[in-house]
Amino acid sequence: MVGSGTDSRYLMYFFTASHPKIGEWLKADMAKHNFCFDPDYRAWDNPVGGSDQQSFHLKGVPIVWYHTGGQPNYNFPSDEAQTINYPKLTDITRASYLTTWHLANEAEY
């Protein structure tokens, strides 16, 4: 859940290593929009795991994955709305939109 996590600024930003522009876009958008998170950029050659990006990667589709490190109650009945960091969730949503915009408007993609 991108709005959760124990550190209010922490964000892992995974992207397909063979598409470095995807990492460059967030860096440029960070400078322009002053988002409330501090990304740890992680270019990935071979993403593994059970998250949603895996099936896209296996088909050769470049991936982006925002991960906030989770929180102890994630996917449990004790997981409640008060654990969501709404400003961070909002900024990650904005950054995701901008990444999608870049993908749609770059001739390479």
Residues covered by each model-derived region:
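Active-site-adjacent substrate-binding region
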Residues: 4-109
